Amino acid sequence: QHLKARPQLCLPNPVAWPLPRFAPDPDPIAWLLRRNVGADQQLLLAVGTKSHQKGFDRLVAMFGLLAQRYPAVHLVILGLDQGPYHGVDQQAQLRRLLPQASHRLHFPGRVGNVQDWYERADLFLLPSRYEGFPNVLLEAMASGCCCVSSDCPQGPAELIRDGVDGRLLANDATPETWAELVSELLEDSGQRRCLGDAALEVRQRFSEERLRRCFMHGVVQLVGDD
């Protein structure tokens, strides 16, 4: 207003369905069975390559609170490479936070069939400290996964309508608060199913075709302002 700046058009990323597939593509059921995780055991899933940004330390702290109460629940984190990342072994760092239940914390690494893992998961969790636009959350919702995210800057609140198609927690929510909500959802398959079914709507809301139309409409408006 004061600097006479031109109007800006900001569009989110689209989601293509089905999600792209590429190698490696380990079957989640077979991969987990080799680690004594049966198809009937509940699975918490997180995805990301940067542990601190994604709040995986928060996630592991929460899981530590739940592990004794739910001995059959496992936590899978996709995307973290083995060995040092910018001088830090992220997998080892997280395992050290969970000494009593580290055998229930699994790191398949980077996979190219993430859709299969979303569909295997009972809950998708994103306790990020900050985001740009969380593609992994968009993908999980498009897969019909029940999702819980921190309401961090920026992005999750653009995707999740709290209590309608997912759940949002304050960015500074404690591990205890996370554990309470995750416990509620683990014990309520009906609520998980309702939230996951409603989340499928992002396939239309963030489709390539719809965002293409939004872009063209925005361009026409910007040109018309000249």
Predicted feature locations:
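Short, structured helix-loop element that forms part of the nucleotide-activated donor/catalytic region
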Residues: 74-103, 191
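Donor nucleotide-sugar binding/catalytic pocket of nucleotide-sugar-dependent glycosyltransferases
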Residues: 1-27
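Conserved donor-binding/catalytic core segment of Leloir-type glycosyltransferases
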Residues: 38-54, 60-63
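Short hydrophobic beta-strand element within catalytic cores of glycosyltransferases
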Residues: 146-150
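Aromatic "clamp/platform" in nucleotide-sugar-dependent glycosyltransferases that forms part
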Residues: 110, 129
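C-terminal alpha-helical cap of glycosyltransferases
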Residues: 208-226
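A short helix/loop element that forms part of the nucleotide-sugar donor recognition site in Leloir-type
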Residues: 21-37, 92-94
